[in-house]
C-alpha cells in the first residue's frame, strides 16, 4: 500500500496528471495481480471486462464443434466422428482475476463427444424398409436416376431430422451431369433436364413407408407413371415440389439407393427395438 502511494506521489512530481495516477493505482488495486499470464498473454492489471474480451477471443480461435460419424457417399466407408472442444469462458475469467501473483494459467478446454459416434454405425444393420421399381427408358433417363440415387445413397438421418430430396440431390442441371429426358408436366409428357428422377423419389417414398417413418411432404403426379401404381408415387421438381420425411425413431437411419440390374432399389437401415448399447 505504501509503495503504491509513494509511486503515485512520484508520478505527480514528474508532472503526470492526477487522473492518470488514479487510474494506475486503481488498476493495481482492482485489476489482475502482477505477473499473471494466460498461455503467453500477460494479464496483469487488466480489469475483469478486459480479461473477458481476451478470453473470448482465445476461446473462439480454439473452439471446434463435435462432428458426427458419417459414411462416404460412394463407397459407404465409415468416416469416424470427431470430438469437439468447448471452453468455459466464465470459469477461465474467474481463474485469471482471482489468480495469485506470477501465476501461469492454461486455457483448458472441455472435450465434447458428438451424439452419433463411430461405434454406433456398427449397430445400424436392421433392414427397416426396402422397395424397388422397374428401370425403364432412355440412357439419359437412366443416368438421371443414377445421379439422384448416388446423391441420396449413404445419407444418415438423425432422430428428429427431416430428409429433403431436393436439398440432398440439389438442382438438376446440365452442368451437374443431368440430361434431357421425358418429364410429366401437367397432363403432358415433355422433355426436361433431370427427367426420370421422380422414380428415385417414388422408390424412396415407398421404402420410407415400409420403414414406418413420418412423411412430411409428398405430392403425386397428375398422370400415373408407368413404373408404379398411381397414388404410390412421389413427384419432385426443383425447387418447389419436394419429398420430405422425418426420422421420428429413437436412433439414426441410413438411406441407401442404387440401380441393381434393371431395378431401382432404395432401402433403409437402422436399429430395431431401442437405443444404442
PLM-predicted stretches and their roles:
Residues 1-277:
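Surface-exposed, secretory/extracytoplasmic low-complexity segments enriched in Ser/Thr/Asn/Gly/Pro
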Amino acid at each position: 500500500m505504501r509503495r503504491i502511494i509513494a509511486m503515485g506521489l512520484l508520478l505527480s512530481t514528474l508532472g503526470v496528471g492526477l487522473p492518470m495516477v488514479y487510474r494506475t493505482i486503481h488498476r493495481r488495486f482492482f485489476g489482475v495481480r502482477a505477473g499473471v499470464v494466460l498461455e503467453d498473454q500477460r494479464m496483469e492489471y487488466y480489469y475483469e471486462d478486459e480479461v473477458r474480451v481476451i478470453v473470448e477471443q482465445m476461446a473462439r480461435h480454439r473452439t471446434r464443434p463435435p462432428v458426427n460419424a458419417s459414411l462416404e457417399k460412394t463407397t459407404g466407408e465409415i468416416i469416424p466422428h470427431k470430438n469437439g472442444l468447448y471452453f468455459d469462458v466464465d470459469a477461465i475469467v474467474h481463474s485469471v482475476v482471482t489468480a495469485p501473483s506470477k501465476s501461469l494459467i492454461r486455457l483448458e478446454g472441455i472435450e465434447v463427444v458428438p451424439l452419433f459416434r463411430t461405434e454406433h454405425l456398427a449397430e445400424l444393420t436392421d433392414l427397416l424398409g426396402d422397395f424397388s421399381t422397374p428401370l425403364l427408358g432412355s440412357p439419359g433417363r437412366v443416368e438421371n436416376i443414377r445421379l439422384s440415387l448416388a446423391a441420396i445413397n449413404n445419407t444418415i438421418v438423425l432422430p428428429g431430422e427431416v430428409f429433403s430430396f431436393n436439398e440432398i440431390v440439389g438442382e438438376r442441371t446440365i452442368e451437374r451431369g443431368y440430361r434431357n429426358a421425358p418429364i410429366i408436366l401437367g397432363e403432358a409428357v415433355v422433355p426436361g433436364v433431370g427427367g426420370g428422377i421422380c422414380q428415385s423419389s417414388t422408390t424412396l417414398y415407398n421404402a420410407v413407408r415400409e420403414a414406418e417413418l413420418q412423411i412430411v411432404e409428398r405430392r403425386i403426379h397428375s398422370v400415373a407413371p408407368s413404373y408404379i401404381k398411381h397414388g404410390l408415387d412421389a413427384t419432385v421438381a426443383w425447387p418447389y415440389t419436394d419429398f420430405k420425411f422425418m426420422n421420428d425413431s429413437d436412433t439414426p437411419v441410413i438411406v441407401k439407393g442404387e440401380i441393381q440390374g434393371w431395378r431401382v432399389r432404395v432401402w433403409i437401415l437402422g436399429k430395431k427395438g431401442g437405443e444404442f448399447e
